[in-house]
Amino acid sequence: MSSVLAAYEQFLQTTEDRSFGDQQFVQSDTLKAEIPVFVLNTNDPQQRFTLMNFCLRLAVSSSAKSAIKQGALLSLLSLQATSMQNHLMIAARAPDAALRIIEVDAIDPQDYTLTINPRSGWDDIKIRAYRALSRDLPISLADRTVFVSRDAEHAVCDDMDTYLNRIFSVLIQIWIMVCKCMTAYDQPTGSEERRLAKYKQQGRMLEKYQLQTDARKIIQLVIRESMVIRQFLVQEMLTADKVGAYTNRYYAMVGDIAKYIANVGMSAFFLTLKFGLGNRWKPLALAAFSGELVKLKSFMSLYRRLGDRSRYLALLESPELMEFAPANYPLLFSYAMGVGSVQDPLIRNYQFGRNFLNTSYFQYGVETAMKHQGTVDPKLALELGITDEDRVDIMQSVEKHISGKAGDDISQPAGAFTMSLSRSAFINNNTSQDFSGARLSNYEQGWSGTNQDETRDVYPESTMHRLQNIEPTDSDHNELLMPELESDSNPFNRPRFTVRAPLIPEISHQNPTTRMNRNINTRDNTRADHQDTNEDRGSNVPDDILGDLDN
């Protein structure tokens, strides 16, 4: 039997094996769209700044085609390089790339008229057409500019330091839009604004050159549609990762943003490893988990074999990304999400409610995490020299801080699959009575926790006996406030607000039928009093007001 299990494990690992770069398999070339990219032959800061604005306008233009927008973005991503043409050769190596280099000798800052080098073969018609494209901005952009600040586009740029601050401010925003371009590009999560605020605080981004929200969204869609741009960006991130700590300003920025982009689309896999395997709890020995544990082992081996590009499978649209989908290990995924919902409050932001989520194993993960809140790892405790007394003290301290919390505390399971915890109720409802045909008042519903259709009549015990002890001879009994609830050793039985008593304390001794009759009589008496008052004031009050009172 052991040989069969070993063969099964080897079989699963073999199914995940991939052989890359086999020379006997040559892919056929496909048709490619020509992508025009602009290369400036000068390092003048004003000319580069003007070309930056021109490329931004082309990238968000309403009438520009997709290939023109992609070429504008590639030119924009190369404006920080000393030699733009050499930097663009990184993108030229992409299988779908068909770049056409357009050499620009000069560009007019006023109307973005290009002066093209004769080697590029452009005529005046194309120059006028591209100038018209740069003017055709979406109507959603305010002030006919891509920037939030109206005067940012036409500011003077007469030194290199000013230009670098501006181009890096724009490039940071483009890289931020890469983070969610392939996963949740249409879901506003707030992470984009937080990252913008971070780089503003660090001084890497000038607020004056912040792009408008609609402009950033258009740029994000261009990146999402272009495999050439995404392959170029992946190569830039790999370069930033390999150069080390001593690097230039641009690659330091790319390396920082790459931390947000790495392993995008693989959150389920890494969260399962973190909360399912990382804790090393005993439920992993369940027989139901054995097959999925072997699968996870083969997936980890596949991830290592993919090398550096394994972190960017979503950007590269790699088919290996499907191997790491949580549907391949649903039980371990459900258990890990239950554990994570207790241990990490950030799991609330992760949409783990899939159709293959097993609610039983999710609840089991929640129970396991709750039970292990104060436990100590025996191996680490032995390393640290923790005694039995220290272990008990640690467990009691953790339990004291966790058990005394409620609401949105970290110990509450997150998500739609919650479970009832072993805690005392806010109000003790063990003394409920059923009355047919009676409708509870709002006051009674507030204490009983029922809606208007239910017929339970429940009062807190500590208040009931106080109301019953009120003497009927007390002339001020109608103005008494409800006594405060008695102190309870259980913190969850304490009231969260002060409640006033009804104006008639004897209401607690009346059954619902008596209360209903009393309300009817009170309503009739009130109506009669209004009629008597109207008759007395009839000669002094206008007719229209009398009509309102009669109704």
Curated annotation (Swiss-Prot):
Entry keyword annotation includes Glycoprotein: no
Listed InterPro entries: Paramyx_ncap (IPR002021)
Region (Ncore): 1-404
Polar residues: compositionally biased ranges: 509-523
Superkingdom of the source species: Viruses
GO cellular component, one term: viral nucleocapsid
Pfam families the UniProt entry points to: Paramyxo_ncap (PF00973)
Subcellular location: Virion; Host cytoplasm
Region (Ntail): 405-551
Residues covered by region (Disordered): 509-551
Binding positions for RNA per the UniProt entry: 180, 195, 260, 350, 354
Comp. bias (Basic and acidic residues): 524-538
Keywords from the named record: Capsid protein, Helical capsid protein, Host cytoplasm, Ribonucleoprotein, RNA-binding, Viral nucleoprotein, Virion
Single GO MF descriptor: structural molecule activity
Function: Forms the helical nucleocapsid (NC), protecting the genome from nucleases. The encapsidated genomic RNA serves as template for transcription and replication; encapsidation by N is coupled to RNA synthesis. Forms the encapsidation complex with the phosphoprotein protein P. Before encapsidation, the newly synthesized free N protein, so-called N0, is chaperoned by P.
Subunit field text: Homomultimer; forms the nucleocapsid. Binds to the viral genomic RNA. N0 interacts with the phosphoprotein (via N-terminus); this interaction allows P to chaperon N0 to avoid N polymerization before encapsidation. Interacts as N-RNA template with the phosphoprotein (via C-terminus); this interaction positions the polymerase on the template.
UniProt domain comment: Ncore is globular and carries the regions required for self-assembly and RNA-binding. Ntail is an intrinsically disordered monomeric domain in the C-terminus.
Entry similarity comment: Belongs to the paramyxoviruses nucleocapsid family.
Protein name in the entry: Nucleoprotein
Encoding gene, per UniProt annotation: N
